[in-house]
From Swiss-Prot:
Residues 117-436, 532-819 form the Protein kinase domain. The active site is at residue 248. GO terms for molecular function: ATP binding; protein serine kinase activity; protein serine/threonine kinase activity. It is an enzyme of class 2 (transferase). InterPro entries: Kinase-like_dom_sf, L-type_Lectin-RKs, Prot_kinase_dom, Protein_kinase_ATP_BS, Ser-Thr/Tyr_kinase_cat_dom, Ser/Thr_kinase_AS. CDD domains: STKc_IRAK (cd14066). It comes from the Eukaryota. Residues 448-471 are annotated as: Disordered. This is Receptor like protein kinase S.2. It comes from Arabidopsis thaliana (Mouse-ear cress). It catalyses: L-seryl-[protein] + ATP = O-phospho-L-seryl-[protein] + ADP + H(+); L-threonyl-[protein] + ATP = O-phospho-L-threonyl-[protein] + ADP + H(+).
């Protein structure tokens, strides 16, 4: 029998003395019972969805949103749903994939839930509408309903569209989650998760004289809120396909859940910008910590004022100023000052020299009295003085007048988490700085005839004073002023990449498309891929083939066509991947576009942006015509991959354990940016401690030998450290150019991790001899040594000695803290255990005829 040839293999092996055991089932059932159970479930799902389509078919809601093309008759829709259900042998994907994506709500449901939009259920108001608390009659869920019917006109509709499309695309634990929306006549409504602790300004600025039971927000919670807000902005600025500038970061837009986790909301002013890096201009004072790069953009941004006075940076008031990520950084700095001081950015109840928070704290800095800015309501001894001083210092760095001198949010996160030691960059003297808002400008000024600023009164504040706002371009000493109001001057000439229409005709027909995964017809995919022709084949992937396609004439896609469509295990993997991947959004994760289950097929549709497997570039570069992955690209791939894994482990609503991080599940786009895929084995774990621990103990080890952590193979318990181990193997593959397992070698040398660890431990080879020979010595020695060291600590046998993924990101940015504090060597006993278990695995594989 000839040895099997394969790219990789996913399997479960028997123990040394036992036989292959069947997978553990929750309950045993006969085939007849299982089939009947599936059919009964299917009829309920089909009936429910069919009824939903019948009610929505022809309705104004569906037609106006143009969310799907519904040209079929009611009967044909039901038949197609039933057909896809039977094709999947009990798996009705159309009712599951995207079930957590925003949906259309009926107006009657929201009307009943808010008691007819009762004033008693108003949570707050501002911007373009009011927010109501609602109890959904359908499932008893409490939500927040933002009613946007108070303003009319094109600008109002554009803002509604901006907020809807922005939030619908985002997936982060520190962003307010959009549940859905409703269009009813002239009323536009957005439905969000309900936040029990309301907005940060309500909690932060309450006074004991108003509420005798009031207790000020403690220091630990304040720090947690600041870190959460920083993580949200970092995600918007750097972790998406297009950069999102929020433009209205303030305490009233930071919501708090039951655990006081920060959730940034209100995306009515948000703008999408393409990433483009300009490394020519930056402040070198931040270089010692991480690469500090100034972002410029290809897409035209709004040059008109948008935001709230007190949080807007000085450059916002100049003619033709473009909003950038540094606009949000400035606003973030002001919010941090509010959190530390417990007072508003602009507060007329203070004496003249303290009305403007930023100007007052700057004067304290010049007088070396930063701690005087701390909230006097905090009990002495309840916080560390150095922590408070560092927080104020960081806030002032973020709110510097010159945007190029402000740090980016990645650097801010490092400063907040203590990822680097030492002092922060020194603050300048503010004596020569112009005042942010001179007191002379705190007077009502006439508004010019060209002013289009919209002002609203915020009911969430204890006192409300309005000022007129001038649109005239004035010197820095005459900044326009207003209080508590968002300024909505946001008309644009550029196009929003998330919209499917020309910006000049924005919402004129009330038609736009949300960019979420959808079911795609088989005929469309046949047409897109030229009937899955060999000429369109781009790669062999897990249990199938990937094809390039052009959908609807303008969307470049990759279609993964799975074989063995009758295999129950593969059907499960197919549905699992769709359900998992459709819930995530990150620039270094492959983007799911849709799926198809017609005619017994299992087709998954992705963006075409990434179409080359990392393993192919690393291990097949000896083939004529194949290019070598250069060192700079390798290092950047590892950094980006680490950010993607951190998003899965720490930044999404649930903790995601991938369980299949390999060089074969990483694809590269034309710019060598990585996209992690292969989510069929992923575990989604609640961040609730009890549920999290219970979920981790379920299941058996599944993955690719050579990448699976020793403790995971032994116990089957999925943990983040198992992913870190797999990540470490990929790092070592990048350094050495050698695959995780090489069966052409002797069995004791087949496992790359053990081989490299032994070589380094015995000092048999120099660094340049370990490096991939195809690099031709063209690499940065310090970076190569860092990656080698990182790969070794990530693949330690004891998971407690491995770094977390956040520590991995810091190491890649140049931090030595982990190595200094926890870089002890692994014991010989642990290495011996790993060696023995690996040799056992290799013997079992050879016994199965796998070479």
């Amino acid at each position: 029998m000839a040895p099997m040839a394969m790219d990789h293999l996913c399997f479960v092996l028997p123990t040394e003395s036992g036989e292959l055991k069947p997978p553990v089932m929750v309950e045993e059932t006969t085939e007849e019972e299982e089939e009947k159970k599936s059919r009964d479930c299917g009829r309920q799902v089909v009936s429910l969805i069919g009824d939903l389509f019948r009610r929505l078919h022809g309705s104004k809601l569906v037609k106006s949103l143009n969310l799907c093309s519904i040209n079929e008759s009611k009967d044909s829709i039901s038949m197609e749903i039933n057909k896809s259900f039977t094709d999947m042998e009990g798996v009705q994907l159309s009712s599951k994939v995207g079930c957590e994506n925003p949906r259309i709500f009926g107006y009657s449901e929201l009307y009943i839930g808010t008691n007819g939009f009762s004033d008693e259920l108003i949570l707050g108001s501002g911007g373009f509408g009011r927010v109501y608390k609602a109890l959904l009659p359908s499932d008893g869920t409490t939500v927040a309903v933002k009613c946007l019917a108070e303003k009319k006109g094109e600008q109002f509709e554009k803002t509604f569209a901006a907020e809807l499309v922005a939030v619908a695309q985002l997936r982060h634990r520190n962003l307010v989650k959009l549940r859905g929306w409703c269009l009813h006549e002239d009323e536009l409504l957005l439905v969000y998760d309900y936040m029990p602790n309301r907005s940060l300004d309500r909690v932060l600025f309450r006074r004991p004289e108003v509420n005798s039971d009031f207790k000020p927000l403690d220091w630990d919670r304040r720090g947690k809120i600041v870190k959460g807000l920083a993580a949200a902005l970092f995600y918007l600025h750097e972790q998406l396909e297009t950069q999102i500038i929020h433009r209205d970061v303030k305490t009233s837009n930071v919501m708090l859940d039951s655990e006081f986790n920060a959730k940034l909301g209100d995306f009515g002013l948000a703008r999408w910008l393409e990433h483009k890096i300009d490394e020519t201009e930056h402040d070198s004072s931040y270089d010692s910590v991480s690469s500090f790069r100034n972002h410029q953009f290809r897409v035209a941004d709004s040059t008109r004022i948008g935001g709230t006075i007190g949080y807007l940076p000085p450059e916002s008031f100049r003619k033709k100023t473009v909003a950038t990520a540094k606009t949000d950084v400035f606003s973030f700095g002001v919010v941090v000052l509010e959190v530390v001081s417990g007072r508003r950015a602009v507060d007329l109840s203070f004496s003249e020299d303290k009305i403007i928070l930023l100007d007052w704290v700057r004067r304290l800095s010049d007088n070396r009295k930063l701690l005087d800015a701390g909230d006097s309501r905090l009990a002495k001894g309840s916080y560390d003085l150095s922590d408070m001083k560092r927080m104020i210092h960081l806030a002032l760095l973020c709110s510097l007048n010159n945007p190029t001198h402000r740090p980016n949010m990645k650097w801010v996160i490092g400063a907040l988490s203590g990822e680097f030691s030492g002092n922060l960059p020194a603050l300048p003297s503010f004596k020569s700085h112009p005042l942010y808002i001179p007191l002379s400008s705190l007077k009502s000024t006439s508004t010019s005839a060209t002013t289009t600023t919209t002002r609203t009164t915020m009911t969430t504040t204890t006192s409300t004073t309005s000022f007129n706002a001038s649109s005239e371009s004035t010197p820095s000493s005459n900044y326009v002023t207003a209080l508590e109001d968002s300024i909505y001057q946001t008309a644009e000439t550029g196009e929003n990449p998330y919209f499917n229409y020309n910006s000049r005709r924005v919402m004129s027909s009330k038609s736009f498309v949300l960019d979420t995964p959808r079911e795609i017809s088989y005929n469309d995919l046949v047409l897109a891929t030229d009937n899955f022709s060999d000429a369109r084949r781009v790669a062999e992937v897990d249990f199938g083939t990937a094809y390039y396609g052009l959908l609807n004439g303008d969307q470049h896609i990759v279609v993964k066509r799975l074989g063995m469509t009758k295999c129950p295990a593969l059907v499960t993997r197919f549905s699992t991947e769709l359900l998992n991947l459709g819930r995530l959004r990150h620039r270094n994760l492959v983007m799911l576009r849709g799926w198809c289950t017609e005619h017994g097929e299992m087709l998954v549709v992705y963006d075409y942006s990434a179409n080359r497997k990392l393993s192919h570039l690393l291990f097949h570069n000896h083939i004529p015509g194949n290019s070598v992955l250069r060192w700079k690209s390798r290092y950047n791939v590892i950094k980006s991959l680490a950010c993607a894994v951190r998003y899965l482990h720490e930044e999404w609503d649930e903790q995601v354990i991938h369980r299949n991080i390999t060089s074969s599940t990483i694809f590269l786009d034309r710019d060598m940016n990585p996209r992690l895929c292969g989510f069929a084995l992923a575990e989604f774990l609640s961040r609730n401690d009890k549920a999290h621990q219970a979920a981790k103990k379920k299941g058996s080890a599944q993955g690719i030998f050579g990448y699976m952590a020793p403790e995971y193979m032994e116990s089957g318990e999925a943990t983040t450290m198992a992913d870190v181990y797999s990540f470490g193997v990929v790092v070592l593959e990048m350094v050495t150019g050698q695959p995780a397992v090489d069966y052409k070698r002797k069995k004791e040398d087949a496992l790359m991790v053990l081989r490299i660890r032994e070589v380094v431990g015995n000092r048999k080879k120099l660094l340049e001899e370990i490096a991939d020979i195809h690099l031709d010595d063209e690499y940065e020695n310090r970076e190569l040594a860092r990656l080698l060291r990182l790969g070794l600590v990530c693949t330690r046998t004891d998971p407690k000695l491995r770094p977390s993924i956040s520590q991995v990101v810091s190491i890649l940015d140049g931090s030595e803290r982990f190595f200094e504090e926890e870089g002890g060597k692994e014991g010989d006993v642990s290495r011996k255990q790993m060696y023995d278990s690996s040799m056992l695995m290799i013997r079992q594989m050879q016994a199965l005829g796998i070479h």
